[in-house]
Amino acid sequence: MADRPQQLQVHPQRGHGHYEGGIKNQRGGGPSAVKVMAVLAALPVGGTLLALAGLTLAGSVIGLLVTSPLFIIFSPVLVPAAIVVGLAVASFLSSGALGLTGLSSLSWVLNYLRCASQSLPREMDQAKRRMQDMAAFVGQKTREVGQEIQSRAQEGRRT
């Protein structure tokens, strides 16, 4: 590998380093007719909307200039009134939220009781059966223990 000569490849560049104006248009010439029509259609609409935005801004500034002295003069009345209105709105909203929570809780309890009352007779029957089975088991066990005691007593008498 050391005995091979190194080769340098040089690729010629087009344009020789000067700027050619960005992306080239494949067809040549200016913008297409569709683009020109789109600009001509959008120009009046954009201008109208810009004029309306300017008028709205001017009206807002004039309204603020006119009402600022009124806000300053009536601020001892307006600030407490705004606080009262804010508290009233907050109380109505919290009242509604608490009422909705109460209704949903009541609905859940009623649904739970309805489901429980439907399954209660079945559970009572199961409890009765378990008690009867347990009573029968205890009776059987008592008989067995009694017989065991009798048999041991008889064995004790014999010996």
Swiss-Prot record:
Belongs to the oleosin family. This is Oleosin Cor a 12. It comes from the Eukaryota. The chain crosses the membrane at residues 45-65, 70-90, 92-112. GO terms for cellular component: membrane; monolayer-surrounded lipid storage body. InterPro entries: Oleosin. It comes from Corylus avellana. Its main location: other. It is a multi-pass membrane protein.
